[in-house]
């Protein structure tokens, strides 16, 4: 049940609109009634939604094709204070090889294969709980990173994303999640298992 709450909450966080890249951190935007509080930190956007949730905040990076203006890759990372765990949602375009999953790669880290959970008309999604070691590896990497997807024809495609501001955005998101989270009480619920490298 904890896994369903975790996945449901992260999926809900991804319903907000896309963002563009920015160069400098910005003060939180004043939130209109029912709208998320937004704070730009380099290439990441920290969002907190005005909902009673075990994880009302996430950090997001969405990259669009400049020519077609279609989303190429979106990454959302949320933190669940009551579980001391993270959840990740990665959205990629359709026409990928579902069985091959995807990987996240940096200069010092390569994730295990992450399996897709679902697809809709907007793309395919990896949605899962991850261990803190994956987040720490992303935070300690220098330079850029990429999501590596595979097509049905066997070709792989690296979709680049930025780690600029990752650590600062992560720390800000975790602090806000701890301050705003409304724990869900569950008797003896174990945290979802994270993939092993």
Model-assigned labels for residue ranges:
Residues 1, 18-20:
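Intrinsic low-complexity/disordered segments
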Residues 8-17:
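Bacterial N-terminal signal peptides
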